Amino acid sequence: MNKKKLALFLILLALVFYPASGENQSAQTIKIMSFNIQTFGVTKMSRPEVVEILVGLVSQADIIAIQEVRSIRIDPVQRFMALLPEKYGYVIGPREGRSSSKEQYWVIYDTEKFTVLKQDSWPDTDDIFERSPFSVYFKTSGAFDFTLIDNHIRPSDAENEIRALPAVVTYYVDLWNDPDVLVMGDFNADGRYFDKTLLNSIFPEDKYRIIFTDEDTTVAASRNTYDRFIITSSASDYFTGNFGVIRFDEVYDFSGYSIRPSQVSDHYPIWAEFYVDHF
């Protein structure tokens, strides 16, 4: 990717991330992204064009909750981090999974805007989840300290795992004594895996806000909202109302390159914006 095209790509991404809005733009806000990066490891890091696009995507957010890190080795993660601006740090969860194909959750964050207070992998004593949710408790410069819960739901057991998520939320609200919780990730909460009409009963509106409801979050020809942000009602007080899906196959022109959009990922990144203080 030449510098001119990369610059254009980043400008277009900025337009996607900073939509016109009637909200007061002088208030300090943060942008949080969730991204199933699809089988991240040595092979993906060996494709320079893929890596440059991923770096461009990730660099537009303040926190990025990543799913599907498959590499046994840590060096692909470290090499990717070295390509990001120095302000970014990360935490990474344990390798999770019942089979030999295990995954890690990876949360990248702007160290100038956030402090990691605590991190934890949910103690799944009943073995409900294929990959136990990974939680990070963040402190901001304002009143909005929050727990981020990163999760990747198993497609073949989506309903059982999704139904267990409110218990995970309650666990961390009690453990860290903070009602502000953001649950995000690849829920596989649509299509043949899950009846998405069940979400409103699992996450009732008096306790939660479901930000993504009918947006297409998959690169495939089918239209499904697999990826989600679900936040507690307390956290919704900080939500600006701005959110979106980064359809990188439309933002970026792939015609002159050897890679296909599906080699970047089979999912689009999703994002939501929050105030750091009550506004």
Where is each model-derived feature located?
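Metal-dependent phosphoester-hydrolase catalytic domains
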Residues: 72, 159, 171-179, 189-279
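Extracytoplasmic/secreted proteins, especially bacterial periplasmic and envelope-associated proteins
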Residues: 49-60, 75-79, 83, 103, ...
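Second-shell loop/turn segments in exported
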Residues: 37-45, 54, 62-70, 92-96, ...
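Structured beta-strand-rich core segments of catalytic domains in phosphoester-bond hydrolases
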Residues: 75-144
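Active-site-proximal beta-strand elements of phosphoester/diester hydrolases
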Residues: 29-39, 117-122, 135-137, 145-155
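Conserved hydrophobic/aromatic beta-strand scaffold that supports enzyme active sites
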Residues: 34, 63, 105-107, 133-137, ...
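Loop/turn elements at helix/coil->beta-strand transitions in domains of secreted/extracellular proteins
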Residues: 27-31, 59-63, 85-89, 112-115, ...
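N-terminal, active-site-proximal structural segment of metallo-dependent hydrolase catalytic domains
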Residues: 2-8, 12, 16-87, 97-105, ...
